[in-house]
């Protein structure tokens, strides 16, 4: 117990010391709110019965961060993200209602996403800060298209990813949520981040099926 208390005290002391550092033009000692923009890419996939491998997409976002306490370099960040999601080489669930044998489906859809992440600032040097983060995200798909091609031919057909009448098993649910974790690095207001998003809600509409959307992501941007 004594060692645990000492470790906790050391952690709080180190947190207080981090509060004085500055990363480039961003000073934790002076600024409690920051704004930023992000641009990057995702490698998204669908798991479960959807079973679709990685599909590369684009991300655009505007973010805002708040430091709730002057004593610790902890930030709460949110924003609005536009992200391309989906997967390719999907199983029979993600195709059309009448899926030919040997067909390949490429699922694509675009989402608006609102994350709510907690970041902790770690000083690397006077110019560089590292910020691990985690938190939930909430998303809603605004559009989507699924393209199905029969292997060995040029024959293909497209359908709306969320089309209950034409998409296999009623298509996908538009709303979803999950967990987001990763690490960011800031240098002179330039910000880089890498991470992974785990879908925790079932996006398959039919009750007897399950599926989740997951994605690796890499973004670059600036914090102002």
Regions found by a protein language model. Give the residues of each.
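Outer-membrane beta-barrel translocator domains and adjoining extracellular loop/strand segments
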Residues: 47-53, 88-95, 144-153, 204-209
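Membrane-embedded beta-strands of outer-membrane beta-barrel proteins
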Residues: 37, 60-62, 80, 114-118, ...
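Outer-membrane beta-barrel transmembrane domain signature
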Residues: 68-74, 104-191, 195-203, 224
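Transmembrane beta-strand segments that form the barrel wall of outer-membrane beta-barrel proteins
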Residues: 37-47, 198-200, 204-205
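Glycine- and aromatic-enriched membrane insertion/assembly motifs of diderm outer-membrane
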Residues: 34-36, 42-45, 51-104, 110-112, ...
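Outer-membrane beta-barrel biogenesis signature
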Residues: 5-8, 16-33
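Outer-membrane beta-barrel "beta-signal"
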Residues: 189, 212-224
């Amino acid at each position: 117990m004594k060692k645990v208390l000492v470790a906790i005290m050391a952690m709080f002391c180190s947190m207080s010391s981090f509060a004085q550092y500055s990363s480039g033009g961003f000073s934790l000692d002076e600024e409690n709110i920051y704004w930023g923009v992000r641009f990057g890419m995702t490698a998204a996939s669908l798991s479960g019965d959807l079973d679709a491998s990685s599909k590369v997409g684009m991300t655009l976002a505007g973010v805002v961060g708040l430091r709730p306490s002057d004593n610790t370099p902890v930030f709460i960040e949110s924003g609005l993200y536009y992200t391309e999601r989906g997967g390719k080489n999907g199983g029979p669930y993600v195709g059309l209602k009448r899926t030919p044998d040997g067909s390949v489906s490429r699922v694509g859809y675009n989402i608006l996403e609102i994350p709510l992440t907690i970041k902790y600032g770690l000083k690397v040097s006077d110019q560089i800060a590292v910020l691990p983060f985690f938190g939930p995200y909430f998303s809603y798909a605004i559009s989507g298209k699924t393209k199905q091609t029969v292997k060995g031919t040029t024959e293909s057909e497209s359908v709306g990813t969320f089309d209950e009448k034409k998409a296999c098993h009623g298509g996908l649910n538009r709303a979803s949520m999950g967990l987001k974790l990763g690490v960011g690095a800031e240098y002179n207001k330039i910000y880089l981040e890498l991470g992974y998003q785990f879908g925790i809600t079932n996006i398959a509409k039919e009750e007897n099926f399950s599926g989740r959307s997951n994605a690796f992501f890499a973004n670059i941007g600036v914090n102002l």
